[in-house]
């Protein structure tokens, strides 16, 4: 099965997958499904049978996009709002606008319909607890505006606060999970049933 993880510091797509290995979720359950990690400023997409995971999120936000029709999922680990500087040659996917363009492009390459995508957002915390630090707020505003401009629904968000977060998406089941701080992993959203496990969060 084809897997794509892209960073714009390289000309070609960069593959970040681990075959036959395992990881443990917040409940200590062992998972054998190969997974792909999106680190800061990276974008990844894959079809059914893969698990997409963000590295820890502070003020960064994980954009988790999914096409239920093809079971193609994508994850962008966004670091900064807006567009990259005009002179930037690398690191463009750290910025919200460029990261979304890359995300939708690589998902389409995997067979997704760009008009059929459902979105969840995770992260955007003020982990340093600085009173005048607004980067986490700016990231959320930038991404929300750009996504709504494309008339794509934002189904669920888990943003804000002061604790690090992580995102995990199962492309086969259409479920997205989030971890906050040292707490156990929780299901945030089911892209097929639209069920929310923790509606009061």
UniProtKB/Swiss-Prot annotation:
Q: List the Gene Ontology MF annotations in alphabetical order.
A: protein-glutamine glutaminase activity
Q: Please give the biological process terms from Gene Ontology that the record holds.
A: chemotaxis
For this entry, the protein name equals Probable chemoreceptor glutamine deamidase CheD
Keyword entries, A-Z: Chemotaxis, Hydrolase
> Disulphide bridges in this chain?
none
User: Catalysed reaction per UniProt?
Assistant: L-glutaminyl-[protein] + H2O = L-glutamyl-[protein] + NH4(+)
Enzyme Commission identifier(s): 3.5.1.44
Q: What does this protein do?
A: Probably deamidates glutamine residues to glutamate on methyl-accepting chemotaxis receptors (MCPs), playing an important role in chemotaxis.
- Family per record: Belongs to the CheD family.
- Please give the superkingdom of this protein's source: Bacteria
- As recorded in Swiss-Prot or TrEMBL, the protein's gene is named cheD
């Amino acid at each position: 099965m084809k897997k794509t993880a892209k960073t714009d510091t390289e000309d070609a797509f960069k593959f970040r997958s681990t075959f036959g290995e395992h990881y443990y979720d917040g409940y200590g359950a062992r998972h054998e499904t190969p997974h792909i990690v999106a680190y800061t400023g990276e974008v990844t997409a894959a079809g059914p049978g893969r698990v997409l995971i963000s590295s820890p999120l502070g003020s960064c936000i994980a954009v988790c996009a999914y096409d239920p029709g093809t079971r193609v999922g994508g994850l962008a680990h966004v670091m900064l709002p807006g567009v990259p500087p005009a002179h930037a040659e690398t690191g463009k996917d750290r910025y919200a606008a460029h990261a979304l363009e890359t995300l939708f492009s690589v998902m389409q390459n995997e067979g997704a319909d760009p008009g059929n995508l459902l979105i969840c957002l995770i992260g955007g915390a003020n982990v340093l607890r600085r009173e005048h630090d607004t980067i986490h707020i700016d990231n959320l505003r930038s991404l929300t505006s750009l996504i709504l401009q494309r008339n794509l629904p934002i189904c669920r968000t888990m943003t804000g606060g002061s604790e690090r977060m992580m995102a995990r998406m199962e492309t086969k089941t259409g479920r997205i999970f989030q971890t906050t701080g040292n707490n156990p992993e929780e299901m945030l959203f089911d892209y097929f049933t639209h069920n929310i496990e923790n509606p009061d969060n």
